[in-house]
Amino acid sequence: MGKVLALAIALLGAVSAEVLAQEPADESRWRVGAAFGYGIRSNPLVQSDDIPIIVDLDIAWFGDHFFFDNGDVGLTFADNETLTASLVGRFNSDRVFFGRTETRFVNIDLAGAPLAEATLFEVPDRDYAIELGIELLADGAWGQLQMTVFHDVSNTHDGYELYADYGYGWRSQRWYFEPSIGASYKSASLNNYYWGVRDDEVNDVLPSYQADSGLNAHARLMLSYQLSRQWSFSLVIEYERLNDEAAASPLVEDQDVFGYFTGFGFRFR
């Protein structure tokens, strides 16, 4: 799931969690919802725009073993009261920032030094990678834990990512509150593909750069109020700190990435 989508989908999750707890066991295999509101995810790249979020959809289908969940497809091979393990295919989310960049004439390089003449500069493009991996989900009275390991199978970056996230939710009548924290380890190949600068991309503005592996950290806070069986009003705030190797890239202007989304969530089924 893309990082931008995750903010709105987290809001919809508050609707689903409350409603699912009230529904019988023969509920529909489909989960369909929509979020209406306003949010922004900051873009850490130089010469880029923040990413707006206004309307988003939550579409998922869960079979006995196979599932589709907002772009992720998977096969669940273990499922019990405390642990679910699945084989999952997805698109890497690091590329999303590169879709909101601009081309401009600049008079200084990225280090702030003046150029002899105005130069046309654009942030190099990057491709989406198709990744395959294992996802483990565990929950209990102690909270919820998600752990994943994904590897590129599309020969895009040929790297891998290790991810872990822990959250604990409180519910009081119509209110639901859930903070979560986590980290993701990016291999050198993955980090360098998205944040490195290759020799054929070097120019008067952009110097060469090779990124090594690194560890991102993130935190999220979700607050929701259940208006009815299908409607809720929620606020989601998210923070991510890029690893030092990514932050040192000449493509990156800000190591800290902030996001928020507030609005109404509606669950169709």
Give the ranges of each region predicted by the language model.
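Outer-membrane pore/translocation modules
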Residues: 71-167, 171, 176, 188-211
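Structural signature of outer-membrane beta-barrel domains
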Residues: 39-43, 92-96, 152-154, 184-190, ...
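Surface-exposed strand-loop-strand hairpins of Gram-negative outer-membrane beta-barrel proteins
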Residues: 42-55, 104-106, 110, 115-126, ...
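Short glycine/proline- and aromatic-enriched beta-strand/turn motifs that initiate or cap beta-hairpins
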Residues: 21-68, 73-74, 95
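Residues on the lipid-exposed face of transmembrane beta-strands in outer-membrane beta-barrel proteins
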Residues: 36-38, 57-63, 75-77, 87, ...
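Predominantly the C-terminal beta-signal and adjacent terminal strand-loop region
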Residues: 226-269
